[in-house]
Swiss-Prot record:
The keyword Cytoplasm applies. Functions in the N-end rule pathway of protein degradation where it conjugates Leu, Phe and, less efficiently, Met from aminoacyl-tRNAs to the N-termini of proteins containing an N-terminal arginine or lysine. It comes from the Bacteria. GO terms for cellular component: cytoplasm. This is Leucyl/phenylalanyl-tRNA--protein transferase. HAMAP family: Leu_Phe_trans (MF_00688).
Length: 230
């Protein structure tokens, strides 16, 4: 399969099944990180992932890591921590700060200036959302991602205190389900999401689920600025 070159003025994408097998899921190169292109990407099961200041790369991996409704796993140690957690969890109160914090990593980052600009614009349009974890007035953890109907595509998370990002994940996952959410897209499986119950499914199964659930209209109250319960 070829690696597709995107047109700067056309936000459409090739079909995800045309992605390369090696590296797994790499579909296209080029284009921009505009809100219009990002929305088209997530509607199609594609996301950007590349080194800052380089040409955008677009992916649709096979398999895909997901956490379906009702499958969240909370181990005994984490459950005990959540009952006693001294943190406050909020929704959509500090998106810009969350994506900035996610970009600061000792091991390097894929979140460069154009990614920040694109997702901040998408947040202003009500399509991208953040979860914040606070200890007093200090932002100590959080996550951000993109909503596609009854699917939430998690992009990145950060933690400056013990279990802070897990608190964000658990609180938001339960909140999203209460409003009819059906699937949390984790993109690529890692130890963090696997511990919370994420599994890998074939890309075709993910795309079928996305096609079905993206048509669902989630109550806009789901995305109001608010506090979330653990």
């Amino acid at each position: 399969m070829p690696l597709f070159q995107l047109d700067e003025h056309d936000v459409t994408f090739p079909a995800p099944h045309l992605a390369l097998k090696e590296p797994s899921g790499l579909l296209a190169i080029g284009g921009d990180i505009s809100p219009a292109r990002l929305k088209e990407a997530y509607q199609t099961g594609i996301f950007p992932w590349y080194t800052p200041h380089e040409t955008p790369l677009w992916w649709s991996p096979d398999p895909r890591a997901v956490l379906p409704a009702g499958t969240l796993h909370i181990g005994r140690t984490l459950r005990k921590f959540l009952r006693q957690a001294p943190y406050t969890i909020t929704l959509n109160q500090a998106f810009s700060d969350v994506i900035e914090a996610c970009s600061v990593r000792d091991e390097g980052t894929w979140i460069g200036p154009d990614i920040k600009t694109g997702y901040r614009a998408l947040h202003q349009q009500g399509e991208a959302h953040s979860v914040e974890v606070w200890e007093g007035d200090e932002l100590i953890g959080g996550l951000y991602g993109v909503n596609v109907g009854a699917v939430f595509c998690g992009e990145s998370m950060f933690s400056r205190r013990n279990n802070a990002s897990k608190c964000a994940f658990v609180a938001f996952y339960n909140h999203f389900l209460r409003y009819g959410g059906q699937l949390f897209d984790c993109q690529v499986l890692n130890s963090h999401t696997a511990a919370l119950g994420a599994i890998e499914i074939a890309r075709d199964r993910y795309l079928e689920a996305l096609s079905r659930w993206k048509k669902v209209i989630i109550d806009k109250k789901c995305w109001y600025q608010q506090s979330l319960e653990l």
